[in-house]
Amino acid sequence: PESAGSVPGPACYDRGNTRPTVTDANVFLGRIAADRPLGGGLLQALRAALSEQAIQKHVAEPLGLSTLEAAEAILTVANAKMAGAVRVVSIEKGHDPRQFAYMPFGGGGGLHVCAMMREVGVATGIVPRYPGVTSALGCVMADMRHDAVQTLNQALSDVNFKEVLARIDQLAEACQARLDSAGVRFVAVDENIALDMLFTGQTHTLQVNVQRGQLSADGLRQAFTEAYQNAFGRVLEGPVIRVMNLRYARIGRRPKFDLSVLAPVGAGIMQPLGVQRVYHQGQWWDAQRYARLELPVGANVQGPAILEQADTTVWLEPGFEAKVDAMGNLLVTAQA
């Protein structure tokens, strides 16, 4: 699948693009209701027939597949690529994704939450109240951070830690000045200190987070050994440890935003909007359609279901369920 951007957009927008996108696959398979107006009044309806034509011409015919098989193949490829990206930042860095929750965001993230949970092995998905504006919301909520880095490139035994502490003080002063210039009120200011380290002869470094009190030869050796063991499952004996870079970050903590103000109020509406036919894993399913923002706190929806709102659509696969928590998030889990 290739991105068509917002202009001209997917084939189903009927704005000149004739090649299939992930959105076209979701529309053709019924996961996005074609008769539903697109958020913000951009379009009053989507043309599923154009999605079908694009998939048929560019994927199904060249590969000798049916159009339904081709559409599912598009999503299989897209999900596999996204799962691969998750593995790069988790498994390949020594983290077990099963210890994390998966949070999709953006207009299309909720359509793939169950597939990604299956692909990566995550037990819980958390769909935020307004996924389509998660990045914008983050800009007004997030703490402010300034980073600095300086090269050391010395053997651990040669490092002058008094000089390192003096450098840290200089970086702290410079980063604090940048925080002050933002004109933002902070409730607290924290610092992060890390060193890029490796064994002599290696080309890759390992970032080791430390406290000021660990900045000694013994303290840093222990911190590096523990980090290396966690990342690679073993520690090399013999090679000299080198310290390549000093990293410093200063974080201004902003007042916390109470996400519960976004939660639904009152009894809400559990009545489905109707039934949508959805093609999933080789067969058709009758999926209930819900107005997601009308669901009350505590509501539990069983898949297959489609939860719609102006900024996103959530596809809840068969075998999954979603519960509205106290902050309006959807907690997605596999059915017991």
Language model region names:
Residues 3-13, 18-97, 104-336:
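C-terminal, non-catalytic interaction/recognition modules in large multi-subunit enzymes and RNPs
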